[in-house]
């Protein structure tokens, strides 16, 4: 029996995870980062940037549903959405399911990610790039939010980890820019790592977001692909009530949307804001594990 090639993630220095490679579909350096897309017998097609897994066909729906539907159903009347990053197309797919939206803008720094994910991960976008409401802008997200004249109801930062091209999307400059281009009652959410292993990211993000938003916090989802399992998402708004929309209201909005999900539902939405004590201790007492 021939031995399969092994691809190892390099996100953490002292531990990590590996994946067997059935077939490499694409591997090269784009203008900004190393991009590989390969097939795995269990997880389907996997895309990684600079040695860190970004998405897999098997469980991408969890990440994309929770980042898209939690803020959109909490808002309840969003018309304009901004996605920062998201070049694989999965976030766009989920956002496009909300038929009442009038405009969906995606700002992606790396055109290569969009091009090759459209070719090799077509199930992620599922045709969403052809939605007439969609506008793609190739630009740095920090620059865009600090220079645009547009306003948005929901901003979703579908960023990489705070290294390489994604580093700027965890800065005060970026958070301040998002605050300036959010409409009144708007919501900002962002990928914020696996808090058990990356607590410093959550603590730092919380401190920075608190400087620009009246209400900031986190919600979570269990996503097997990301080492450590429990992914944390940053949340920020000027209206604290948006983080506490009741179950009955969410259920009505979800029913009116007339689509189903594989992970998200209104009860999961409410429960996702219940945080483990170790994270609360890190955020509010400075005690870390």
Swiss-Prot record:
One GO biological process term: spermidine biosynthetic process
Pathway: Amine and polyamine biosynthesis; spermidine biosynthesis; spermidine from putrescine: step 1/1
Annotated active site: 158
Record flagged with keyword Cytoplasm: yes
GO molecular function, one term: spermidine synthase activity
EC class of the enzyme, as a word: transferase
Record's catalysed reaction(s): S-adenosyl 3-(methylsulfanyl)propylamine + putrescine = S-methyl-5'-thioadenosine + spermidine + H(+)
Domain PABS: 5-238
Primary localization class, coarse: cytoplasm
Record's keyword annotation contains Cytoplasm: yes
Free-text function comment from the UniProt entry: Catalyzes the irreversible transfer of a propylamine group from the amino donor S-adenosylmethioninamine (decarboxy-AdoMet) to putrescine (1,4-diaminobutane) to yield spermidine.
Entry similarity comment: Belongs to the spermidine/spermine synthase family.
Name of protein: Polyamine aminopropyltransferase
Natural source organism: Photorhabdus laumondii subsp. laumondii (strain DSM 15139 / CIP 105565 / TT01) (Photorhabdus luminescens subsp. laumondii)
């Amino acid at each position: 029996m021939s031995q399969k090639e092994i691809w190892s993630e390099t996100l953490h220095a002292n531990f990590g995870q590996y994946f067997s490679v059935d077939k490499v579909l694409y591997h090269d350096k784009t203008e900004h980062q190393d991009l590989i897309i390969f097939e795995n017998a269990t997880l389907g097609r996997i895309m990684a940037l600079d040695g860190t897994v970004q998405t897999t066909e098997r469980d991408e729906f969890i990440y994309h549903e929770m980042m898209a539907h939690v803020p959109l159903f909490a808002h309840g009347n969003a018309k304009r959405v901004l996605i920062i990053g998201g070049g694989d197309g999965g976030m766009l797919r989920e956002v496009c399911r909300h038929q009442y939206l009038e405009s969906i803008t995606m700002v992606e720094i790396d055109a290569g990610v969009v091009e090759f994910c459209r070719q090799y991960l077509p199930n992620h976008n599922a045709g969403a790039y052809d939605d007439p409401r969609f506008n793609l802008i190739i630009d740095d997200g920090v620059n865009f939010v600090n220079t645009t004249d547009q306003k948005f109801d929901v901003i979703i930062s579908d960023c990489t980890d705070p290294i390489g091209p994604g580093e700027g999307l965890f800065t005060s400059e970026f958070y301040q820019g998002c605050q300036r281009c959010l409409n009144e009652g708007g919501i900002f959410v962002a990928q914020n790592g696996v808090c058990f292993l990356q607590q410093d990211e959550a603590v730092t993000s919380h401190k920075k977001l608190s400087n620009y938003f009246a209400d900031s916090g986190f919600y979570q989802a269990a996503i097997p692909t990301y080492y450590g399992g429990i992914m944390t998402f940053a949340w920020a708004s000027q209206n604290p009530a948006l983080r506490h929309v009741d179950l009955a209201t969410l259920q009505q909005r979800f029913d009116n949307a007339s689509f189903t999900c594989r992970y998200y539902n209104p009860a999961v939405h409410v429960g996702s804001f219940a945080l483990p004590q170790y994270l609360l201790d890190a955020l509010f007492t400075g005690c870390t594990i």
